[in-house]
């Protein structure tokens, strides 16, 4: 609680020194308030959610009961957190919030409310269901509690959705990498090269035991994403021009700027419902449930479910807020 208050106090003091216009002051204040709410949500709301799930640190996890050196491999909780964070984050909390920035600061509000009340809870219970059901996937759990027909439906539905998500998660990074200036006039500037390379990596990461590729490289990439997000946030603060006072938050709405917060889309597109389907990753995304079994099979204690699953989604919310602010 004290740390959250210190962060908010620092943010407001910073704004009083370094912001320039009432419009920018308002956006930055909303940003710091959102970060504080995310941290407070993890500190106070996530223990309540954990209590409802009936987590028991004394029972054996699937990793201890089914350890076979392939999928059920013990992973340190910090590594597990970074892997889960990278699994759910990717390009989603970057592209979505940047597009959602067209709707103004209300995008930040949606990310925070969706994350604390929906996304983080969803991810946490996805992990809970999997670890309580021997590390099974969502279709397998559905088949266990319903019937084989429903299991088949869930398998087909999940496969279709993952196909479309997979296409985006292949084409997007391939396009970014092939357009880098350092690869100009080389084979690496070919988009097809990166598509095939990413596909090959996907197959290897899927077929090989989890401790061969995923546990070695994912934590590094997850840490790099956190460092990148922090660097962007610091850059936004450093490059912000000189501001008057944090009290501009109220003055901003007293002036003729309320429309910037409520309906700023340049194409006149309505906030409801388009904002909520523009920004999913960072706020709430059902696709995250497909990633839950990967780490649920590797946790050595149920007490790690909350920091790994709820914590990873909270961090994704912070990533979304930073990119939304950059877009705004």
Model-flagged regions — what are they?
Residues 23-24, 37-94, 301-304:
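Membrane-interface "cap" regions at the ends of multi-pass membrane proteins
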Residues 28-43, 47, 100-130, 150:
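Extracellular loop-to-transmembrane helix junctions
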Residues 27, 178-192, 217-218, 262-268:
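Interfacial loop-to-helix junctions that mark the boundaries of transmembrane helices
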Residues 100-106, 131-137, 144-149, 296-306:
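Juxtamembrane helix-boundary/capping and inter-helix hinge elements in multi-pass membrane proteins
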Residues 75-92, 235-242, 253-326:
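Hydrophobic, membrane-embedded alpha-helices of multi-pass small-molecule transporters
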Residues 166-170, 174-183, 192-194, 205-206, ...:
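Hydrophobic alpha-helical segments and their helix-loop junctions in multi-pass secondary transporters
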Residues 38, 118-134, 138-207, 280-284:
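Helix-loop-helix module between adjacent transmembrane segments
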Residues 34-44, 158, 162-166, 222-239, ...:
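Selective recognition of specific alpha-helical transmembrane segments in multi-pass small-molecule
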